[in-house]
Regions:
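Regulatory cytosolic signal-relay segments
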Residues: 1-44
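PAS-family sensory/regulatory modules and their coupling/dimerization elements
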Residues: 1-13, 198-204, 208-210, 215, ...
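A structural signal for short, hydrophobic beta-strand segments that form beta-sheets
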Residues: 4-5, 90, 193
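Short hinge/gating elements
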Residues: 6-13, 97, 144-148
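Flexible glycine-/small-residue-rich
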Residues: 7, 50-53, 137, 213-216
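Catalytic NTP-binding/metal-coordinating core of nucleotidyl cyclase/transferase enzymes
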Residues: 20, 32-111, 118
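Intrinsically disordered or compositionally simple regulatory linkers and C-terminal tails
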Residues: 21-32, 214-234
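Catalytic beta-strand-to-alpha-helix segment of the class III nucleotidyl cyclase homology domain
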Residues: 101-206
């Protein structure tokens, strides 16, 4: 007689593929681990961060290609460090832009703002840099692109569009991120300026999005930008 014992409950020590592939250490150690060509999987909800450098073309013109390129590469290193510190993963760079993913929205917000402050307050003799950033949270699809795991879907597309609403030094976040309890608590404690924004985004013309702009304390003192209009379109 044979008796079969089966346990269907998740182990407390188990992690999903979505969680593992969203960690920087996994991408560093297993960079070539990917899905079969043509295969895609839903990985649940992730927080997607897109960043871009403000006026990078002007920087190349003013200080020369070699020095500007060095600053861009250093800026990638800074972002990667803060992203990893918050248990996120840098997925790819596109020109001067970065795509990263996190399991928790508050981790994305903290990583961005820590990096933003480091860029705004460089060492003596350094050149300040300003980021534009969009953060969104929602379901994503994982695929293999250029032999690496990448993410696609509306959540990613919206995060990329939010960058276009930025002015520099700020971040625009979706309502899904804004309403997250951990994000609300963090922003309340950090005392950054929060501006409500309502916008239509390219490719989503039938819908207006309720968004929020985060203007960090260190950016407020330096900014001469006009106040945010109630409705914007990008």
């Amino acid at each position: 007689q044979v008796m079969l014992l089966e346990r269907t409950a998740w182990s407390d020590n188990a992690v999903t593929a979505a969680e593992v592939t969203g960690l920087q250490v996994f991408r560093d150690l297993f960079a070539r681990e990917a899905l079969r060509p043509g295969e895609e999987i839903e990985v649940g909800s992730l927080c997607v961060l897109f960043t871009d450098l403000l006026e990078s073309t002007r920087m190349y013109r003013e200080i020369g290609d070699a020095r500007a390129f060095g600053l861009v590469m250093q800026h990638f290193d800074v972002l990667k460090r803060h992203i990893a510190d918050e248990d996120g993963a840098l997925v790819k760079t596109i020109g001067d832009a970065v795509l990263a993913v996190f399991r928790r929205p508050v981790s994305a917000v903290r990583a961005l703002l820590k990096a933003s402050r480091e860029f705004a307050e460089p060492a003596p003799g350094g050149r300040p840099l300003m980021l534009k950033a969009g953060i969104n949270y929602g379901p994503c699809i994982a695929v293999t692109l250029n032999d690496r795991l990448d993410y696609f879907g509306s959540t990613v597309n919206i995060a990329a569009r939010l960058v276009g609403l930025c002015r520099g030094g700020d971040a625009v976040i979706s309502s899904e991120v804004r309403k997250d309890a951990e994000v609300e608590a963090y922003l309340r404690e950090a005392r950054h300026q929060i501006e409500e924004v309502r916008a239509a985004l390219k490719g989503f013309d039938q819908k207006h999005f309720d968004l929020a702009r985060i203007v960090p304390r260190w950016a407020m003192a330096k900014s001469d930008l006009p106040s945010t209009p109630k409705t914007e379109r990008f």
